[in-house]
Amino acid sequence: MSSPMLTVRDLEVTFTVDGDALKVLDGVSFSVAPGQTLGLVGESGCGKSVTALAIMGLLPRPHGRVVGGTIDFEGEDLLALPPEQMHRVRGNRISMIFQEPMTALNPVQTVGEQLMEVYRLHRPDYGKIQRKAAAIAMLQKVGIPEPERRFAIYPHNLSGGMRQRVMIAMALACEPDLLICDEPTTALDVTIQAQILDLMKGLQAETGMAILFITHDLGVVAELCDEVVVMYAGRAVEQADVFELFDHPRHPYTHGLLGAIPRLNGQPKQLLNTIRGQVPALHEMPAGCRFANRCPHASERCSREVPAVEQLAPHHGVACHHWKELTP
């Protein structure tokens, strides 16, 4: 595999709530290479979207702050860039597709106006005619029929799938090296979801861009991703090649997520597997492993000692004191 395009090392983020700095991300590390798709998975509140916002430099101010670690993108530490330089990176070399295509677009601007705005900001040498031509070509590239007509309409005239295609067009307008996708298929039905995933795979094959794909849907992970980082309560608990992760999960949380997937060959009226308990609140994080209060393998050591990441193979690491108990 080629050298990483993006390397996140020991990332720490805090949010200030009622005067207290609560750690939302704690030592998150991963890397993404050109042409690779890395999945960030975990249940709601585990820090996936915060990780993306930290990379983009879009943490809510003044409450959200990066307090540790580095974010290296193509040889530059994004955390050290002045705001004007980060502005040139964001939307140009790194783009992001946000959640909820139904609400992410501006309802009082036409599709074309919003897409042309991307070119106005990041391609200042383009004139109005060139911006319009580029926008229409981009709409056609992402599979929107009659792009000239759709250019002039408002988002409410489009279906959810078409709005998501517009979001993808806006994100890819400047041909970014890295595309961050924050649950881009959550609000779509399974047929449209499959179309969007196929579109993204095709565009990636064409451009060679890297993709950081955030989701809680392990089916999407299996379809799209090359490697996976499993997050829980602000920490990366397991990272592996997608086939290795599905075949040989080593962290109890990963094992629980996979076990909760409904099976087509299950028995009638069979109860679904669940992970007992719930994610601890930010102000109640345990001193040791954050999954300890829900883990069937937890010991006293887990409640007091943070597990270090152990490399089980070149592309498989796990942060668990008892991972050997999950070895088949």
Language model region names:
Residues 4, 21, 148-149, 239-328:
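Short catalytic/signature loops enriched in Gly
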Residues 16-19, 57-63, 80-81, 86, ...:
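ABC-type ATPase nucleotide-binding domains, specifically the catalytic core motifs of the NBD
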Residues 67, 77-95, 121, 128, ...:
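ABC ATPase NBD coupling module
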Residues 43, 180, 184, 188-270:
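P-loop NTP-binding/switch modules centered on Walker-like glycine-rich loops
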Residues 74-77, 129-149, 258-259:
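Conserved ABC ATPase "signature" region
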Residues 173-177:
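A short, proline-enriched helix->beta-strand linker immediately N-terminal to the Walker B motif
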